[in-house]
Amino acid sequence: METSAFLEFIRLVVAGDADSVSRRLSAAPALATTASPVGATRQEATGFFFTEISHYLYAGDTALHMAAAAFSSPMAKLLISHGADCRAKNRRGAEPLHYAADGNRWEPRAQADVIEYLISIGAEPNAVDKTGVAPLHRAVRTRSLAAVRALLDGGANPRKPNKAGSTPLHLAVQTTGASGSGSDTARRQQAEIISLLLERGARPTDKDARGKQVYQAATSERIRTLLKEGKAG
């Protein structure tokens, strides 16, 4: 399959053009499982950025990866009905659920819906990519409360460490440049995520690979207070 034809198909998936996607799949069923032979790199990224969903296409991504990134349950269901694999990994080891957990834009209901759908058909909420990152780590880092809740409801481990030994709670208490972390909205999301993780069994005494407890990773007195109280205030 020509790369240009595959990229055009991905554009249709991202745009949510179900009729065109259906026609392409009927003509070329392999599109449902084809892994992208190209993708964003440090040298060339612009051509693989989809502004509609604020997400890059990476080598190894399937159409389902991009439907998940678009938070499109209808498109994900269409692709699955044509044989797409909800456990497909790209070259970085990321699965569609990893992309669904990213909070690149504010569509909480749609994001939660696609996460719930993927888990319902067999996506593994604790799957890790090549860097040891699970979907919950992504959702926490991007301050996506709806995604965090959907993942926890679907069986994500609130104490799962990444390769650095950081648990979701370690990540939740740190400042992140994503999603406008300095805004009032982001701070509220952060507080609610911390409270939710604590409710679901996360422990402030857990240590990362360097022996640092969550308390020590907290970047402000406000966050340390939340940890002590065990709730958002």
Task: Give, region by region, the residue ranges found by the protein language model.
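Ankyrin-repeat boundary/"N-cap" motif
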Residues: 3-9, 34-63, 89-103, 128-134, ...
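Eukaryotic tandem repeat interaction scaffolds
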Residues: 112-113, 124-164
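Leucine-rich solenoid repeat scaffolds
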Residues: 198-199, 203-232
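Conserved ankyrin/ankyrin-like repeat signature
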Residues: 20, 74-75, 113-114, 146-147, ...
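Ankyrin repeat A-helix N-terminal signature
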Residues: 11-16, 54, 66-72, 99-111, ...
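Ankyrin-repeat and related helical/solenoid repeat scaffolds used for protein-protein interactions
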Residues: 146-149, 153, 158-210
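N-terminal capping/linker segments that flank leucine-rich repeat
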Residues: 1-15, 19-23
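Ankyrin repeat domain, specifically the short helix-to-loop turn at the C-terminus of the second helix
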Residues: 25-31, 77-85, 116-124, 149-157, ...
